[in-house]
């Protein structure tokens, strides 16, 4: 369906040229995370944001949102908006989105469906910016672009640079502690097939843990990225096991509980000493955005005890 609509829009764009692009001086031109040049109008009044985490970031920058996805409302970022997807943004109603004529669309560069939507939106002459926010540095970069579009530089200072200083202090405090905590970070699904360890290369929490001075056993045991090898985990015997869930949260928790009840797993140091922790979803499954310092402080306390 998207492909058919895209072909029609490409024909239309050939006939209409680039008249819909913001003239020089009336918008901010930048390169998005798909490597494409975007010209976003300054202070747009009708904006669509297609994931809840990006909606949170746009609101933090001082923007307003008229069109979004159901998860944005479920997480309490907005009370009401026109929805083009009832869930998390994986099945966007592209025809309705285009019909609404937003001045700017902000979408995920990570979701294949949204990348296709972005292509169709560009063909329709609608400015669209695709972003990938995996680390605090990504957050700062995207926040800066958003505050430039919205002409709210003070938001970048209070919700960006001020947070950087807090995080730098937390990292310095953690690095000054004695010892190197050895951890296993797991993204848990409903069964062994969907439960795997993660590293700094493929999960932002592992980037944070590394910055705080922790040693992730999966970094030296890539077999854990394919599944939780009991033999490898026993050999490494981590000080702590941290996990988040994917998909059905209750099923992920139930699977981890059943795994940790196994006598072999319960014999691990982390199990014996009560250092198995499910990380809060709002900080470690979704991106924490303006709560990055809170997320770093939470991990620091798990690794070392109370923060300074």
Residues of each region from the PLM?
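Extracytoplasmic ligand-binding site segments that recognize negatively charged/polar headgroups
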Residues: 113-116, 132-145, 180-204, 250
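Short helix-initiation/N-cap motifs at beta->coil->alpha
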Residues: 33-35, 83-95, 221-230
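Alpha-helical, coiled-coil/dimerization segments enriched in small aliphatic residues
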Residues: 72-74, 195-225
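Bacterial Sec-exported substrate-binding components of ABC uptake systems
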Residues: 5, 10, 17-53, 154-186, ...
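Proline-aspartate-enriched helix->loop->beta-strand connector
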Residues: 94-107, 126, 229-243
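A short, structured surface patch at a secondary-structure boundary
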Residues: 46-100, 104-111, 214-217
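Structured C-terminal subdomain patch of bacterial secreted/periplasmic proteins
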Residues: 138-141, 145-148, 157, 161, ...
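Extracytoplasmic/secreted envelope proteins and their assembly/folding machinery
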Residues: 41-44, 51-59, 94, 98, ...
């Amino acid at each position: 369906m998207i492909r058919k609509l895209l072909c029609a829009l490409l024909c239309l764009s050939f006939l209409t040229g680039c008249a819909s692009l913001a003239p020089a001086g009336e918008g901010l031109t930048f390169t998005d995370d798909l490597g494409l040049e975007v010209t976003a109008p300054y202070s747009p009044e009708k904006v669509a944001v297609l994931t809840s985490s990006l909606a949170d970031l746009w609101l933090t920058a001082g923007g307003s949102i008229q069109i979004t996805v159901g998860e944005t409302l479920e997480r309490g970022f907005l009370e009401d908006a026109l929805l083009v997807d009832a869930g998390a943004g994986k099945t966007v109603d592209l025809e309705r989105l285009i019909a609404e004529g937003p001045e700017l669309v902000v979408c995920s560069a990570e979701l294949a469906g949204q990348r296709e939507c972005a292509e169709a939106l560009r063909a329709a002459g609608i400015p669209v910016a695709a972003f990938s926010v995996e680390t605090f540095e990504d957050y700062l970069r995207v926040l800066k672009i958003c505050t430039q579009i919205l002409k709210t530089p003070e938001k970048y200072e209070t919700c960006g640079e001020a947070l950087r200083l807090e995080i730098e202090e937390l990292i310095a405090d953690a690095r000054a502690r004695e010892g190197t905590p050895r951890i296993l970070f797991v993204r848990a699904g409903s069964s062994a097939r969907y439960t795997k360890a993660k590293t700094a290369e493929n999960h932002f929490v592992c980037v944070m843990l590394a910055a705080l001075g922790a040693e992730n056993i999966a970094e030296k045991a890539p077999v854990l990225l394919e599944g939780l090898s009991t033999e490898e985990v026993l050999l490494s015997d981590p000080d702590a096991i941290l996990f988040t869930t994917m998909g059905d949260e209750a099923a992920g928790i139930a699977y981890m509980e059943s795994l940790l009840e196994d006598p072999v797993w319960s014999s691990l140091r982390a199990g014996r000493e009560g250092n198995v922790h499910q990380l809060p979803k709002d900080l470690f499954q979704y991106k924490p955005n303006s709560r990055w310092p809170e997320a770093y402080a939470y991990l620091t306390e798990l690794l070392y005890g109370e923060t300074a």
